[in-house]
Amino acid sequence: MVLVHEGDQVATPQSPDTCPVVPGPGSRIAAGLDPEIDLVISGHSHQAYICKIKDPAGQDRYHTQGSSFGRIITQIDFRVDRKTRDVIRSSVSADNHVVTRTITPDPEVEAYVQTWKERVSVVANRPVGNITATIARDPSGAGESPLGNLIADAQLEAAREGGAEIALMNPGGVRADLTYPASGSEGDGVVTYGEAFTVQPFNNLVQVVTLTGEQLRRLLEQQWTESYTRVLQPSASLTYTADLTKPIGSRVSDIKINGIPVTDTQRIRVAANNFLIGGGDGFTVFTEGTELWSGPLDIDAFVAYLSAHSPVDPPATDRITFIR
């Protein structure tokens, strides 16, 4: 069996045991894997589904996902041939169960969790910086968010050693707001390590690759597809115009770095997390990049920026000019 961090979207919410998916990268991976694989457990898209997909040999195999944040538990049962030690494909069954939280907590598990909460709190409650107001992850009408822009600025600063000129952050990787009201006893406007980690919890590396101006334009065009829109959060050094009245693939113009127009042949050092550099969220142009440089973890870059620039104001969301 294969566990893969990629999945599909659900067209309309239905029972978690059904398969109302819009075929996407998860289905394509599940359909293309070796016929010897009997089960594909997917993730990433935070959906609930139990599907059967034909493998390359034309045989059905399960392709499942159990939503996110512990809301669904996928129960998978199968038998193994004792002689061959192979999974009997016809015996595989899968069911998604909604977590209702109606069961009595196990005292031993609760005690174990509490022990680690107390140990982690020493690190989590450590102040790392200050903010002047809540810095939100929700995008503005231009598709930018103050927090997304802040993270891009932090990653650009952390990647200067790798020659970075601009940075781009995927909006899905911004997991929570930085709130001005205190979450504990730290005081209003104080950012703790735990709060910063909640914003950036993936431990991705900040990396840099070289793209041409033409490749950067194609990368930015990948923000819009027939299925979805994902606006990359730009560092302050990058500005451009996006004309939404034009066809998909022809919307981006007037790209500038530090106010200077970008040419197609120009070589640009672009910073992003390793998820994006690997082509994640459909930004495949990143994989054309050369001269890879790897730097710090994204959380370390974020914490360092907050510490160095406190108190931090919410960045303006004026780096992309939209025409509608």
Where are each of the predicted segments found?
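Glycine-rich phosphate/diphosphate-binding loops and the adjacent beta-loop-alpha structural elements
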Residues: 125-144
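Feature captures C-terminal
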Residues: 53-62, 72, 86-88, 94, ...
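Conserved protein kinase catalytic core
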Residues: 11, 48-50, 176
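Short acidic, glycine-rich surface-loop motifs adjacent to enzyme active sites
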Residues: 1-15
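Generic alpha-helical structural element
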Residues: 18, 105, 120, 140, ...
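Active-site-adjacent helix-turn-beta-strand microarchitecture at beta-sheet edges
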Residues: 18-126, 227-231, 247-253
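Divalent metal-coordination and catalytic microenvironments
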Residues: 1-2, 40, 44, 78, ...
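Short, ordered loop/turn segments at secondary-structure junctions
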Residues: 5-7, 44-46, 68, 171-173, ...
